[in-house]
């Protein structure tokens, strides 16, 4: 009976952890600076198909990036709210460019980011892929290791 109870608790734990991972997925924006300038947001977030709405180009020979307008992301945090935006998603990878980013919450967690400044600048990043933290939610975020620990302690108490 105890084994059945423990097995049931572990099964419930796996279901809860999977649900927590889907509902509260990682707040990571994966921006790829390439010829296609495609980007995607992992997890439950939605984004436009093109990172810079066809206004960015990448020159491999001169290693220069031309950026005039950033993307519009529909990220929608917990309960569709935005808690903290990252204003340096592009500027972090263009140290030689003074980035003026205007990020505002429009509605339902939609962010519009516009960048202005010199059109071309030297790119010093060796890699063309960068992981940028977009925002973080307020309150407790259930992680798999924390959830497993909590349910594991609860299972030991029932034994």
UniProtKB/Swiss-Prot annotation:
List the signal peptide residues.
1-20
GO cellular component terms, semicolon-separated: fungal-type vacuole; plasma membrane; side of membrane
**In this UniProt entry, which residues carry a covalently attached lipid of the kind GPI-anchor amidated glycine?**
137
Stated membrane topology is: Lipid-anchor; GPI-anchor
Entry-linked InterPro entries: Yeast_PIR_rpt
Inducing factors: Expression is regulated by AZF1.
Pfam families, from UniProt? PIR
Principal localization reads membrane
PROSITE patterns for this protein? PIR_REPEAT_1, PIR_REPEAT_2
List the keywords (alphabetical). Answer: Cell membrane, Glycoprotein, GPI-anchor, Lipoprotein, Membrane, Signal
Where does the UniProt annotation locate this protein?
Answer: Cell membrane
Single GO molecular-function term?
A: structural constituent of cell wall
PIR1/2/ repeat boundaries on the chain = 101-114
Which residues, in ranges, are excised as the propeptide?
138-159
Q: Can you name this protein?
A: Probable GPI-anchored protein ANS1
Species source reads Saccharomyces cerevisiae (strain ATCC 204508 / S288c)
């Amino acid at each position: 009976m105890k084994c059945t109870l423990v097995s049931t608790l572990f099964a419930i734990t796996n279901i809860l952890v999977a649900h927590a991972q889907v509902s509260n997925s990682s707040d990571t924006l994966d921006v790829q600076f390439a010829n296609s300038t495609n980007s995607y947001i992992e997890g439950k977030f939605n984004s436009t198909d093109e990172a810079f709405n066809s206004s960015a180009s990448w020159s491999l020979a001169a290693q220069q990036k031309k950026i005039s307008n950033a993307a519009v992301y529909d990220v929608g945090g917990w309960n569709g709210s935005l808690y903290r935006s990252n204003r340096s998603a592009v500027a972090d990878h263009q140290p030689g460019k003074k980035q003026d980013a205007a990020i505002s919450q429009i509605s339902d967690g939609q962010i519009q980011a516009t960048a202005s400044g010199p059109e071309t600048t030297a790119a010093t990043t060796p890699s063309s892929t960068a992981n940028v933290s977009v925002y973080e939610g307020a309150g407790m975020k259930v992680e798999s290791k924390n959830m497993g620990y909590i349910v594991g302690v609860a299972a030991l108490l029932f034994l």
